[in-house]
């Protein structure tokens, strides 16, 4: 019986992750994130479209510009939270949480929502980078050096961690305020607030500014990811306890 319950619980978690990665909001966020990354390339994108003869960028060069571009980084918090950050609050408010907890158990419902939110934020960033790479390759008709180096892989990993962090923060803010819009606006406002603090008041604290997370601080990002997931679980427990 315990094994059956465990299997049912794991299926519930997998179901939440699948819903997070296949829902319409994930696809909307994927298109928006890809567009933001493309706009972050700037003048290199113009040269790409004009098919300039002296175009010398490799695929890694272009994707690194996209991943580190200000526009892509400024939109990252809200877009990362878009696919699934408000889902837990929605289920709690509409009463669907009762039947979900009855089927899978409270613990598995909580883990499913936390996993779906975090994984969707991370996968979104990787998928957008992959889609942009395909678009850039297609625009050049295959006439581009397909060089993917270690620097790109590390930068993409950092961006994925940022996506997971902001998605978790969005879920926490939505549950804390009991407002769905806080899932998207909350991470964006927090990001801008930290940017202002870092630039104006604590310039020496480089990693206080989220824009700089993409350039380093791997251990810090892993720690923030862990803390954000734990906070998410705490608020999910509180939310489900009040309504179930």
Residue ranges and their predicted role:
Residues 25, 105-107, 111, 179-184:
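Membrane-helix interface segments
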Residues 26, 34-86, 111-177, 213-223:
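Secretory targeting signals
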Residues 86-119:
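Helix-loop-helix units of permease transmembrane domains in multi-pass membrane transporters
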Residues 29-35, 180-194, 209-211, 228:
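Central hydrophobic cores of alpha-helical transmembrane segments
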Residues 19, 89, 101, 174-175:
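Helix-capping/transition residues at the boundaries of transmembrane alpha-helices
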Residues 198-219:
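Extracellular/periplasmic helix-loop-helix junctions in multi-pass membrane proteins
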Residues 2-3, 225-244:
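Junction motif at the cytosolic side of a transmembrane helix
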